[in-house]
Swiss-Prot record:
InterPro entries: Ribosomal_uS4, Ribosomal_uS4_bac-type, Ribosomal_uS4_CS, Ribosomal_uS4_N, S4_RNA-bd, S4_RNA-bd_sf. One of the primary rRNA binding proteins, it binds directly to 16S rRNA where it nucleates assembly of the body of the 30S subunit. It comes from Salmonella typhimurium (strain LT2 / SGSC1412 / ATCC 700720). Disulfide bonds: none annotated. The keyword Hydrolase does not apply. Changing residue 206 to T: Confers streptomycin independence on streptomycin-dependent S12 mutant P90R. A RAM mutant. This is Small ribosomal subunit protein uS4. Part of the 30S ribosomal subunit. Contacts protein S5. The interaction surface between S4 and S5 is involved in control of translational fidelity. GO terms for molecular function: rRNA binding; structural constituent of ribosome. Residues 96-156 form the S4 RNA-binding domain. Pfam families: Ribosomal_S4, S4. NCBIfam families: PRK05327.1, rpsD_bact. Keywords: Antibiotic resistance, Ribonucleoprotein, Ribosomal protein, RNA-binding, rRNA-binding. GO terms for biological process: response to antibiotic; ribosomal small subunit biogenesis; translation.
Length: 206
């Protein structure tokens, strides 16, 4: 399955919620009618079965983190093997992706932009360049912008934008040095209440 390259707002309208695929310079409800389905007049959303609700939740989370279907299923399998709550383990694995950590630290305005920084070798982990977006960041790892990439206007713009967002408590960021520390894995209470991971577990448990 190829990565989706179409209109980002269309995906948010399909899921009926902001997937944070755009930079956030303007509120998403000023860009499109988020409550309406895609299409000129917004097709009426059908009443979903239990399976349909579970599938939509999985698609929503997968799109938020920019993960392909096969990758997402593999994350679920790994989450199920780990001790503890499978749903919470799944979210922790997704949050631990390098592209997501770069976004959370404010170095990228969106996860897609953060992923691009990683693939363009602009990101270092503990002083070494890592260009794999799915790389799992571990507690106490230091993530930083390479010296030659610090002058990029998009990085500076992203950091300014990040000042308007709530700062994650599991990260410690020095915006001046353009580096941050992944202090710990986020707990469920740290993350969005708009995600219902239990529906995803129910979907894959069938």
């Amino acid at each position: 399955m190829a990565r989706y390259l179409g209109p980002k707002l269309k995906l948010s309208r399909r899921e009926g919620t902001d997937l944070f695929l755009k930079s956030g310079v303007r509120a998403i409800d000023t860009k499109c009618k988020i409550e309406q389905a895609p299409g000129q007049h917004g097709a009426r959303k059908p009443r979903l079965s239990d399976y349909g609700v579970q599938l939509r939740e999985k698609q929503k989370v997968r799109r938020i983190y920019g993960v392909l279907e096969r990758q997402f299923r593999n994350y679920y399998k790994e989450a199920a093997r780990l001790k503890g709550n499978t749903g919470e383990n799944l979210l922790a694995l997704l949050e631990g992706r390098l592209d997501n950590v770069v976004y959370r630290m404010g170095f990228g305005a969106t996860r897609a932009e953060a992923r691009q920084l990683v693939s363009h070798k602009a990101i270092m982990v503990n002083g070494r360049v890592v260009n794999i977006a799915s790389y799992q960041v571990s507690p106490n790892d230091v993530v930083s912008i390479r010296e030659k990439a610090k002058k990029q206007s998009r990085v500076k713009a992203a950091l300014e934008l990040a000042e308007q967002r709530e700062k994650p408590t599991w990260l410690e960021v020095d915006a001046g040095k353009m580096e941050g520390t992944y202090k710990r894995k986020p707990e469920r209470s740290d993350l969005s209440a708009d995600i219902n991971e239990h529906l995803i577990v129910e979907l894959y448990s069938k």
